[in-house]
Each structure stands twice: as structure tokens, then as C-alpha cells.
């Protein structure tokens, strides 16, 4: 067993507040996070915050994520249950970048040596997809209505 980590960086033209609010709204994940998240919501709590547990996924595979840090609009951390790894913790850090936001999404987990490399690649690819999708979904629409 060993500890392994990854880091994903994405940029958004949305403000840190807009990105944070999107990520903090568990029921909305199903609207923007892609095909792996068909269902999303809170198990405990109603608006998030430290101690709240969100359930994300698609039948029959779900994860439960317990919010461990909630510092709007700059930082959110959570621990994850329901995956074949131990001690999985993620942190999303948001920083102003010009007129937008830099999203730094990192994860750490413990896994057997033989599984660590493929699990790290899978988790990194999944989180990269979430970061890219969140960056786009948080951006206000520029389409004008007629």
C-alpha cells in the first residue's frame, strides 16, 4: 500500500464565485458533469457545507463525498467513499486568473501498488473531465435572446 496523488488544472472565464457555487450545488452535478453522473444530491444537509454528504453517480455505481472544507469562493475539500481505494481525499482550489478562474483539483488516495497506476490514471481522467465541464458550465451564456 502506498499514497498516490494527481493534480488537474483547468481555466474558466467564470468568476471563482460562479465556479464554487456550481461545484457546491450537489443536485446540479447531473446537469453538467457528464454521463457518469446521472444522479446527484445531498444525503445529509440541504445546502452543503462542512459535514454534508453528497451522493453522485449512476446505477449501480455511486460515490458518497463528505465535505471536509468549505471556504467560499476559494477552496472545497471532500473525502470519498464507494471506490476501490482507501483514504481518498480531494481538494478544489479556485483562484482569480485575469477575468476568470484557475481551477486546481487535486486528489490523494491509498491503493495497493499493482492497482495504483491504473487507478491514478482513471481518477485523474475522471476529475479532468469534471474540471473541464465545470469550467464551461459555470461560464455565463453569451448568447443574446431575441
Question: Model regions: which residues?
Answer:
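Hydrophobic ligand-binding cavity/cleft-lining segments
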Residues: 1-43, 146
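Residue-level preference for beta-strand/loop junctions
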Residues: 2-4, 48, 59, 86
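Hydrophobic-ligand binding "helix-grip"
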Residues: 31, 55-102, 108-110, 140
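Anionic, Ser/Thr-rich low-complexity intrinsically disordered regions
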Residues: 35-42, 46, 77-80, 103
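Catalytic cores of transferase enzymes with a strong primary signal for eukaryotic protein kinases
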Residues: 39-40, 45, 54-56, 109, ...
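A conserved amphipathic terminal alpha-helix motif
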Residues: 108-146
